Amino acid sequence: MISSNDFRPGVSIEWNNGVWRVVEFLHVKPGKGSAFVRTKLKNVQNGNVVEQTFRAGEMVPQANLEKSLMQHTYKEGDQYVFMDMETYEEARLTAAQIGDRVKYLKEGMEASVIRWGEQVMEVELPNSVVLEVVQTDPGVKGDTATGGTKPAIVETGAQVMVPLFITVGERIKIDTRNDSYLGRE
């Protein structure tokens, strides 16, 4: 059990027949009446976001989520198959469960799979990935590191803004949290 006073972004709770993650919270103490905690919660299973108010100090069951490192082995139809390299147990997730991070998912990549009991909830990709540029405008003599940026498409199909000097075939490091270019590899 966790007190509503201890809510922080990223805390997972069992509420309303599901697992919810706290996205935002605000502890409010009105001049008259008792304090309360206004939260924005995201359903881990389906991605729904709701706003909910809890009384200050209200006890809520904390979700017991297990995180395990698994490798993305292949894609079958609309499902992505992950395998635990120690137990050889498979987990299947849809693109909707993975979310917009699916654009950086590559076969052979290791990722953290989060489970609630036996049910697979979501995947956390590494903070950065190294991918090859497959399409971008050619570099022109005089392009510098301090110049502007141009769009580039990497091997997984994701589009990233890169410096002007990057060419097709180069391997670049990308931050998966904000889709930004970090450097050459």
Curated annotation (Swiss-Prot):
Pathway: Protein biosynthesis; polypeptide chain elongation. It is found in: Cytoplasm. It holds the Pfam family EFP. Keywords: Cytoplasm, Elongation factor, Protein biosynthesis. One of its GO terms (molecular function) is translation elongation factor activity. Disulfide bonds: none annotated. GO terms for cellular component: cytoplasm. Its main location: cytoplasm. One of its GO terms (biological process) is peptide biosynthetic process. SMART domains: EFP, Elong-fact-P_C. Gene3D superfamilies: 2.30.30.30, Nucleic acid-binding proteins. Belongs to the elongation factor P family. PANTHER family: ELONGATION FACTOR P (PTHR30053), ELONGATION FACTOR P (EF-P) FAMILY PROTEIN (PTHR30053:SF12). Involved in peptide bond synthesis. Stimulates efficient translation and peptide-bond synthesis on native or reconstituted 70S ribosomes in vitro. Probably functions indirectly by altering the affinity of the ribosome for aminoacyl-tRNA, thus increasing their reactivity as acceptors for peptidyl transferase. This is Elongation factor P.
